[in-house]
């Protein structure tokens, strides 16, 4: 697998892990004991795939979930990608009830591995920081 394909594969694995977490969390967030387990599972996903930026990981604090889910591969396809050495950008289109949004994930290659470093969404021609 090529260097840049590894970046895409890392993002897809992250999205699959997050989708599984979102599905589990919608069923279990009402139970206080399950909240701690969900928080630990989410932290493990972030530790495996993401840099340690606190703003990127705001969901660890809120445990928020949107419906429809944020990371369902069928409804959030990668529509474009850019590569520049040790950085890669993947653009994901979201369609919620006819309202489209474009997200951009920045990946960085550090310590012999690709990491998600930033998520942004396009608003009025400007990229705005978002959290995972």
Model-derived segments and spans:
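Poly-acidic low-complexity segments
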Residues: 2, 26, 70-75, 117
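N-proximal accessory regions
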Residues: 2-5, 9, 36-41, 84
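Short hydrophobic/aromatic beta-strand element in the GNAT-like acyltransferase core
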Residues: 11, 89, 104
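A structured, charge-rich N-terminal accessory region that forms the first stable segment of a protein
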Residues: 17-56
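Surface-exposed, charged secondary-structure patches
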Residues: 41-99
């Amino acid at each position: 697998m090529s260097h840049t394909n590894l970046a895409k594969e890392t993002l897809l694995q992250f999205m699959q892990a997050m989708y599984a977490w979102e599905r589990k969390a919608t069923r279990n967030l009402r139970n206080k004991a399950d909240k701690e387990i969900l928080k630990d599972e989410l932290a493990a996903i972030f530790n495996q795939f993401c840099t340690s930026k606190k703003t990127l990981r705001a969901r660890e604090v809120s445990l928020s979930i949107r419906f429809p889910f944020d990371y369902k591969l069928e409804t959030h396809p990668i529509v474009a990608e850019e590569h520049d050495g040790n950085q890669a950008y993947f653009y994901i289109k979201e369609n919620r009830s006819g309202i489209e949004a474009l997200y951009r994930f920045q990946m960085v290659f550090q310590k012999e591995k690709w990491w998600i470093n930033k998520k942004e969404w396009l608003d009025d021609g400007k990229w705005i920081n978002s959290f995972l």
